[in-house]
Amino acid sequence: MLLLASASPARRRLLEQAQIPHQVMVSGVDEDQIHHPDPAQLVQLLAEAKASAVKLKVEQSAELNVSIKAVLGCDSVLAFEGEVFGKPVDAAEAVARWQRMRGKWAELHTGHCLIPPSFAPTTEGRAPEMQCTCVTTRVLFANLTDVEVEDYVASGEPLQCAGGFALEGRGGCCVEQLAGCYSNVIGLSLPLLRRWLSLS
């Protein structure tokens, strides 16, 4: 059983579609307290903080679920022209970002951290090890008109997503091309997770 340290519905849907048994426990980590100038490093730090916080909650729980194989923390940001874009704070910011990004490439970074709890079974006498990395996918945005930008932002979808778009939703119509892992843009890299789980 995988424990997802995230409140993201998109990440949960990915796990459900991949038929990976899981539960969800929100970390409660204050993301505003974690900083790093490199977006790839930033998302790794955030993912590790979330996974570590949930691991601690699980280990201190009176109702310990020994079926939990590992805790997975994830966090995503969009890097565009040297700036890091998380979720837009409001519609005006989302519109301004889209007007800058349209017709251009950006990088979607997702940090992943997999931590086996201390009670997880060891393999060949070795203690379970934490694994953390960042997966990056390049995204080419469609050259939307102002009307198309405003219409998409008015749907409310961009306000819920890192970078201001949801590839699995209406935002999929606003992306021309991807270079890299598709599921990574939605919230986590399923190929990476498959490799990690096969080794744990």
From Swiss-Prot:
UniProt cofactor(s): a divalent metal cation
InterPro entries, A to Z: EAL_dom, ITPase-like_fam, Maf-like
GO MF: nucleoside triphosphate diphosphatase activity
One of the GO biological process terms: nucleotide metabolic process
Catalytic machinery residues: D75 (proton acceptor)
Record bears the keyword Cytoplasm: yes
Top-rank lineage group of the source organism: Bacteria
Main location: cytoplasm
Pfam families the record matches: Maf
The name this protein goes by in its record: Nucleoside triphosphate pyrophosphatase
